[in-house]
C-alpha cells in the first residue's frame, strides 16, 4: 500500500473516533460504457454488472483470478508494472471494439491507493497510472461525470461493496 486515503475519492469513511479508515476496500475490475460487453465473449465465470452513469463492470473475482494466474491487486498491493498476460490479452481483445479501463484499488487501515490501465483500439491508450485518484481518472476517460455525487467513483456506485467478490453475489 502506498499512500493515505483522500477522503474525497469515494473510499470508505473514517472511523468517527480515530479519523482513520478501519474497513478494508479492494476492487479489481474492467469497466466500459454500458452495452460494450454485450457482443464480447466473456470467459467462463465472468459476468457484467450494470452500474449507474451508463457504465458496465466485469468484476475480476478471486476464483477467476486464481484460474488465470492474475494476482490480487498487482499494482496497488504489489510492485507490478505490467498487466498479467491473461488480463492484458482480455483488455487488448475487448478494446479492439470499444474503450475500456482495468481498475484496481486496495485500502486498509487508512492507507492505500488506486490504479488504472486504459485501452482503446486493441492496445494501451496511456501508461499505467497508480495514484489516489486513478479510478476517477479512468471513469472520466470513459465519459463519466460526477454530477451531484462527491466524485465519479461514487456517481457510478463503486462504493456499494467493499470487496470485488461481493459484486458477484
Each language-model region and where it sits:
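Short, extreme N-terminal segment that most often corresponds to the first beta-strand
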Residues: 2-52, 169
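Charged interaction segments
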Residues: 10, 53-55, 60-169
Amino acid at each position: 500500500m502506498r499512500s493515505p486515503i483522500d477522503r474525497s475519492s469515494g473510499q470508505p469513511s473514517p472511523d468517527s473516533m480515530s479519523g482513520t479508515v478501519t474497513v478494508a476496500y479492494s476492487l479489481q475490475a474492467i469497466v466500459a460504457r454500458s452495452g460494450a460487453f454485450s457482443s464480447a465473449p466473456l470467459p467462463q465465470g465472468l459476468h457484467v454488472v450494470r452500474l449507474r452513469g451508463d457504465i458496465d463492470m466485469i468484476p475480476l473475482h478471486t476464483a477467476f483470478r486464481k484460474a488465470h494466474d492474475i494476482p490480487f491487486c498487482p499494482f496497488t498491493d504489489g510492485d507490478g508494472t505490467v498487466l498479467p498476460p491473461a488480463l492484458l490479452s482480455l483488455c487488448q481483445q475487448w478494446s479492439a471494439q470499444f474503450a475500456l479501463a482495468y481498475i484496481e484499488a486496495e485500502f486498509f487501515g487508512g492507507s492505500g491507493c488506486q490504479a488504472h490501465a486504459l485501452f482503446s483500439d486493441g492496445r494501451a491508450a496511456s501508461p499505467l497510472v497508480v495514484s489516489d485518484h486513478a479510478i476517477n481518472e479512468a471513469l472520466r476517460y470513459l465519459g463519466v461525470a460526477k454530477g451531484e455525487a462527491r466524485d465519479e467513483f461514487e456517481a457510478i456506485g463503486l462504493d456499494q461493496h467493499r470487496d470485488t467478490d461481493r459484486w458477484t453475489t
